[in-house]
Amino acid sequence: MILITDKKGFYITTPIYYVNDKPHIGHAYTTLATDIIARWHRINGENVFFLTGTDEHGEKIAKAALAKGKNSQEFVDEIVKEYKDAWNDLNISYDYFIRTTDKAHMDVVQ
């Protein structure tokens, strides 16, 4: 979890989760803790930006996709849906869900 605060606002992020498998209780714990902190700062009148998301590159993902008989993008799209559904079920108040396969993300990091 990263916390950055200044007079303009408060920025907080979860780890960018690696999506070689479905979300588990550890992901939920970290995201819920981050959400609680974001909500506390909002209640106190701060302009909060809460980021979460997924890291969708790497050999583990390629192997997991292959084991399921899918290409990597199809596989991560399905897993990301599970993350988003879980955060919705937990009423997580994130402002932006970043994916490392998003064009905007790839443009920035190149």
Feature map (PLM): residue ranges:
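N-terminal, positively charged nucleic-acid-binding surface of large information/translation enzymes
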Residues: 1-110
